[in-house]
């Protein structure tokens, strides 16, 4: 679900990239590509952080009848899978952007290699890590897919150094969100109450932190739901730019 949501919002930018490709506007491709990547990361990374921090509470709510050993297995597997959320979202959005540039063959090659690696890693890890091997196979598939697709996209569009700074900012904010969510997970024992309060507080803090840090510039999110509210908040928090 987090991957679907992040890709659904980010992929709305892909037609603009296709239009820029037809005009051979490399700057526009690079700019809109950065927006799509940041949007996918902002949503998927936060979702992954919440999954990891509240993994024990999520399992307790969804599967209250599991015994202790089963619960520990499910929690660990959920934590492993949480790493695939941002990587899966990025893999899909980079693939969509490459196809918008009309380089579909590159995606076929990259996906074929990623699937082959996933099968190999899963087969090896299952013999050593049991059920967790499937999770490690998913991580390998997503990670290699991101690396290959991102490499091809930036070969086609050129590097974007500002995006590196923005991604670093998003990562730093999510570290803080993890610590905040982890505190709720530790100190509130009731699973439902911990999840509800922790998620609401962390979500609010996350939006404020993203707006304050200026992850998105100007009209970068034009057409995205709630973009006007986000920019109004960002302008108030970044008052020194007014």
Predicted regions and their residues:
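Transmembrane helix-bundle signature of multi-pass secondary active exporters and lipid flippases
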Residues: 1-7, 11, 47, 84-88
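Short alpha-helical transmembrane segments in multi-pass integral membrane proteins
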Residues: 32, 37-53, 65-69, 128, ...
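Interfacial segments at transmembrane-helix termini and the short loops linking adjacent helices
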Residues: 52-85
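Membrane-interface junctions at transmembrane-helix termini in multi-pass inner-membrane proteins
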Residues: 82-113, 124, 128
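Alpha-helical transmembrane segments
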Residues: 94-102, 150-165, 216
């Amino acid at each position: 679900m987090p991957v679907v949501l992040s890709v659904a919002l980010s992929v709305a930018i892909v037609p603009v990239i296709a239009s820029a490709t037809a005009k051979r506007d490399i700057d526009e491709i690079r700019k809109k590509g950065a927006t799509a990547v940041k949007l996918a990361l902002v949503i998927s990374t936060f979702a992954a952080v919440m999954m990891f921090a509240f993994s024990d509470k999520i399992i307790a709510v969804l599967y209250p009848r599991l015994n202790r050993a089963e619960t520990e297995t499910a929690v660990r597997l959920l934590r492993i899978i949480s790493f695939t959320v941002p990587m899966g979202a990025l893999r899909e959005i980079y693939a969509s952007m490459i196809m918008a540039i009309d380089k579909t063959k590159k995606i076929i090659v990259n996906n074929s290699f990623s699937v082959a690696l996933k099968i190999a890693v899963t087969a090896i890890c299952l013999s050593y890590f049991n059920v967790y091997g499937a999770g490690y196979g998913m991580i390998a598939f997503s990670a290699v897919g991101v690396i290959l697709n991102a490499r091809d996209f930036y070969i086609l569009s050129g590097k974007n150094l500002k995006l590196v700074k923005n991604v670093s900012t998003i990562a730093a904010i999510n570290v803080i969100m993890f610590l905040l969510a982890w505190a709720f997970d530790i100190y509130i024992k009731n699973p439902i109450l911990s999840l509800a309060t922790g998620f609401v507080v962390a979500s609010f803090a996350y939006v404020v932190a993203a707006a304050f840090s200026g992850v998105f510039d100007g009209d970068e999110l034009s057409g995205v739901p709630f973009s006007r509210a986000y920019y109004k908040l960002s302008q108030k928090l970044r008052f020194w730019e007014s």
